[in-house]
Amino acid sequence: MIQGIGVDIVDIARMQQRIDAASGFRELVFSPAEITYCESKANKYESYAARFAAKEAFLKAVGIGIDFSIDLNQIEITNNKAGKPYFVYTKQVEALLLTHIGFVPDAQVSLSHSREQAIAFVLFNKN
């Protein structure tokens, strides 16, 4: 049974500005594995923007929003061998989810981008 859905769209040029500003934004928002993945891509800013959109869409789907006490770099988006993205949560995130919504969601995520924008759609079920 579907428990939550979320969607978010991110302007890629704005994401590039935030990452290039050298303010530590990249490390605050993305895990080391995500940074390695995005930096390996020819169009790295599209990958960063899509992952950022996924994190915001996830928080919307769960109903806790971006201002909740979850560090975004603790929610990781990685890919399986076929390239399908999926979420990996730290124990800290799992504990916060258990406290806030009573379970750790089995979230599905879809990412896409054009030259200007990235979008993510998240749907989750209760395990």
UniProtKB/Swiss-Prot annotation:
EC number(s) from the headed UniProt entry: 2.7.8.7
Keywords: Cytoplasm, Fatty acid biosynthesis, Fatty acid metabolism, Lipid biosynthesis, Lipid metabolism, Magnesium, Metal-binding, Transferase
Keyword Lipid biosynthesis: yes
Class in the EC hierarchy, top level: transferase
Pfam families, alphabetized: ACPS
InterPro entries documented for this protein: 4-PPantetheinyl_Trfase_dom, 4-PPantetheinyl_Trfase_dom_sf, ACPS, Ppantetheine-prot_Trfase_dom
Reactions catalysed: apo-[ACP] + CoA = holo-[ACP] + adenosine 3',5'-bisphosphate + H(+)
CC annotations in GO: cytoplasm
GO biological process: fatty acid biosynthetic process
Intracellular or extracellular location(s): Cytoplasm
Cofactor(s) demanded: Mg(2+)
The keyword Repressor is annotated on this UniProt entry: no
Annotated Mg(2+) binding sites: D8, E56
Job description of the protein: Transfers the 4'-phosphopantetheine moiety from coenzyme A to a Ser of acyl-carrier-protein.
Family (UniProt): Belongs to the P-Pant transferase superfamily. AcpS family.
NCBIfam families noted in UniProt: acpS, pantethn_trn
Protein name, per record: Holo-[acyl-carrier-protein] synthase
Lineage: Bacteria, Pseudomonadati, Bacteroidota, Cytophagia, Cytophagales
